[in-house]
Design a protein with these regions (language model features):
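Acidic, serine/threonine- and glycine-rich low-complexity intrinsically disordered segments
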Residues: 200, 213-267
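Solvent-exposed N-terminal domain segments of exported/luminal and surface proteins
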Residues: 1-226
């Protein structure tokens, strides 16, 4: 987990969005090392870029690839092209399904608005009904410089150290804006679909001091509403609402708040 993202301000991000680099990216196959990494600054968002500035960094640039979405997503994008709009508050208006904004719309927009369009496109990319992943490792890297490799099983082949390793199961289910459900108003036919965009579940399985901790996150269709978060704590043996104060605190011993983890929401 890269702590530099926690020290990056909104203003730095906005200034980066407004940059218009005159240089072309290096060609595919180029190997970027510490002495060259500065040439990537204009192309990598602040916070992430600083996480790449270490002595042994080695980045091999690859050819861009295409990962075509499901045909239903393509059809929904074409059917509703030009309908979605960005509100004065950055909210997404008049959106049904498919990709909200075309590349042409993004290129023609003022930089800040273009960035918001990209955010909404990311949220509403093709994701089927969601994601179900088991045994995900959260690796908290430390400041000690132990000999390489840190942990071959985890794919950490460089120097450094692990401060903490947490394992969890994760599920997210989308209830609305589903392009493959065109005949059902793009929504799942359950009661929660009246108010929710998605439901998300985390269950931490190790180490023992966090095992059994569970988060249930509900993102509402109302873009101005906060995510509703309920947490089950095995030490308290009860379910409770995640408070506003807790939302502003680092989650599970990381440098990130829960809102950081949940990413762009338009608020």
């Amino acid at each position: 987990m890269v702590s530099s993202t926690a020290n990056t301000s909104e203003q730095q991000i906005l200034e980066w969005v407004e940059l218009n680099p005159k240089l072309d990216l290096p060609i595919a196959g180029t190997i970027i090392r510490a002495k060259d990494v500065e040439i990537l600054r204009h192309w990598i968002v602040p916070g992430l870029f600083e996480g790449l500035t270490f002595p042994d960094v080695e980045i091999t640039l690859q050819e861009t690839q295409k990962f075509p979405p499901d045909q239903s997503f393509v059809l929904a994008t074409d059917r509703h092209a030009g309908e979605a709009q960005i509100g004065e508050d950055g909210s997404l208006k008049n959106y049904s399904a498919g990709q909200p904004f075309s590349h042409e719309q993004i290129k023609a927009a003022e930089p800040t608005v273009a960035g918001i369009m990209v955010g909404w496109n990311q949220n509403h990319r093709w994701q089927h009904f969601g994601l179900d992943a088991r045994d995900i490792d959260l690796i908290y890297l430390g400041s000690k410089q132990n000999d390489a490799p840190i942990n071959t099983k985890l794919g950490l082949l460089g120097q450094g150290s692990i401060d903490r390793l947490i394992t969890f199961d994760y599920r997210r289910v989308y209830l609305n804006n589903l392009s493959m459900l065109a005949g059902r108003e793009y929504r799942v036919e359950i009661e929660d679909a009246e108010t929710l965009f998605f439901k998300e579940f985390y269950e931490f399985t190790s180490p023992h001091n966090v095992a059994g901790t569970r988060f249930l996150v509900e993102r509402k269709l109302d873009q101005h509403a906060d995510d509703q978060v309920n947490i089950y704590s095995p030490t308290e043996r009860r379910v409770r609402r995640y408070s506003a104060r807790e939302r502003a605190d680092p989650v599970m011993g990381s440098n990130f708040t829960l809102d950081d983890v949940e990413a762009f929401s338009g608020r």
